Amino acid sequence: MFGSKIFSRLFFKRTYATYKRFDNTTSSSSFTTSYAHLLTNRKTLYIGGGLLGFYVYNLHDAPYTHRSRFIWVPYWLETKIGDYSYRQIYQQFQSQILPHSNPLYNRVSTIMNKLLDVALNDNINDDLNARFLNHLKSLKWEINIIQNDSLPPNAFILPNGKIFIFSSIMPICKNEDGLATVLSHELSHQLAQHSSEQLSKQPIYMVLSTILYTITGVSWFNDLLINGVLTMSASREMESEADHIGCELLARACFNPQESINFWHRMSQAEKKAAGIVSQEGGYLNTWEFFSTHPATSRRIADIQKWMPQLLQIRESSGCYEYGRFYNFNKSYFSH
């Protein structure tokens, strides 16, 4: 939900390179001729063919949704970046992290253990390839609850399995099903390798930015165009995908998917109050989605309502109404 923002701040303070503009006195005809020559050059064609082959070879289907996406970043690099992010964040909030003896830690770990058991279960999850599943199982999962109600409500999971939850989000979660909504969403970002997908696209965005700059000579316009048309759109798509996967996970783990709708209603009210944007009628205004990294909350609610019949069916077929479904659940992915 919010993890991608922190991830981006740490590694991509500026997504696109800034280029010095050289002599721009070339006529339009010479400009066109130069590009035509470049495009028909045999070496250029070889390089372009190789890059196209590399792109096609690294197209993979996302779990659950089966969306085709480009990912070339290896697991070890994704984990190393997660380690770097973890050290930065832990150093910043170390004094505010609750001890494992705190009741809230036990509450969060119980929910996460159920979600991880469903997500990493070989007999249940056939959407993840065996190699990636083993990679996820090898991670040292860890929960860090940051006690500071003055901070914005937030939660995220890094690619190395480190989980961060801000105490300010707990009143919005309200109950276990609401908390499961947040945690399953964040876990879904890692199951779908959204961090790797974002990293994989950065070179493409930089190349496009360079090409646009040679045409327009205006870097801010190029940034605006690429952000609005590509970057923001891709981010919203990944957020919606995490919503979808997360809802399926929590339904399989026997949480109530209908509470997800209530959670997003509460989140919507919290966001609007924090923004302080009030309409003339006394209500709150919606932000323009086009330049947002996240879908509008109303859209997220509508999506979950659309998925609800399927989610309830998944929950029923998971044996959630059988006595003792999690009664003997003792497996823990977290070391104390």
From Swiss-Prot:
**Residue intervals annotated with topology Mitochondrial matrix:** 17-154
Q: Where does Zn(2+) bind?
A: 185, 189, 239
Q: Give the UniProt subcellular location, in the record's own words.
A: Mitochondrion inner membrane
State the EC number(s).
Answer: 3.4.24.-
State if DNA-binding is listed as a keyword: no
Spans within the Mitochondrial intermembrane topological domain? 174-336
Q: Which CDD domains would you find in this protein's record?
A: M48C_Oma1_like
Q: What class of enzyme is it?
A: hydrolase
UniProt cofactor note: Binds 1 zinc ion per subunit.
Keywords assigned by UniProt? Answer: Disulfide bond, Hydrolase, Membrane, Metal-binding, Metalloprotease, Mitochondrion, Mitochondrion inner membrane, Protease, Transmembrane, Transmembrane helix, Zinc
What processes does the entry annotate via GO biological process terms?
Answer: mitochondrial protein catabolic process; mitochondrial protein processing; mitochondrial protein quality control; mitochondrial respiratory chain complex assembly; protein quality control for misfolded or incompletely synthesized proteins; TOR signaling
Q: Which Gene3D superfamilies match?
A: Metalloproteases ('zincins'), catalytic domain
Q: Which InterPro entries match?
A: Mito/Outer_Membr_Metalloprot, Peptidase_M48
The answer to whether UniProt assigns keyword Zinc to this entry is yes
Description of the deletion phenotype: Cells are resistant to rapamycin and display reduced TOR signaling.
Q: What does this protein do?
A: Protease that is part of the quality control system in the inner membrane of mitochondria. Cleaves and thereby promotes the turnover of mistranslated or misfolded membrane protein. Required for TOR signaling.
**Family according to the record:** Belongs to the peptidase M48 family.
Q: What is this protein called?
A: Mitochondrial metalloendopeptidase OMA1
Species the sequence originates in? Candida albicans (strain SC5314 / ATCC MYA-2876) (Yeast)
Q: Which gene encodes it?
A: OMA1
